Amino acid sequence: MARNAQNAYPYYFNKALDSGVTSAEFSELVTHTAFYAGWPNAFAAAGVLKGIFDERGVAVEDLPTVEEARLPTEVAVPDDALRAAYIAAHIAPASEALQHFTNDLLYANLWHRPALEPRDRALATVALLAALGQSAFFPVYLTRALTQGVTRTEVGEMLAHTAFYGGWGYAIQAAEAAKSVFDAQDAGA
């Protein structure tokens, strides 16, 4: 979804659902994608996914709601204090509105939604960032993913997968960023 490859959506969306991704998880993944790959990409995916859900008999009642209880911060975003400090120091001086939406919408809402396990949300985010060539923020999100239980092997597989769907250049950028994170962890930093 990060690259808006709409012609491939029906095949891959069905494959994901046939492989055990639940309709609720997929719906939540599309919502999450909107924040990292842009709303137009998510809207395109949602249209295709609605058709697939209709074919499979998935009802709106089967999908996550806005009113769901939220996960505690220490579970959803274990590095939230560091994240908030970074946003206050580096984003707020340029855009208080972006700080507001980042804190109150992205983190206080989206990252706390229970329809995706925190480790799965973190892995999806690093996959999106890799496919979009967003290597500047990749280390922060990768560190969170590793903290939430994503393994280095899973990261390696995701990076290899990214090469085919996001392009080799983006996958290599993300691999270099991942190596830096791994090296820092190995050094005890």
Language-model region placement:
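Extended hydrophobic/aromatic segments used for targeting, binding, or gating
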Residues: 139, 148, 153-162
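Short loop/beta submotifs within extracellular cysteine-rich repeat domains
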Residues: 5-9, 132-138, 164, 168-172
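Structured binding/interaction patches within domain cores
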Residues: 7-8, 23, 33-36
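Helix N-cap / loop-to-helix initiation motif
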Residues: 20-27, 117, 149-153
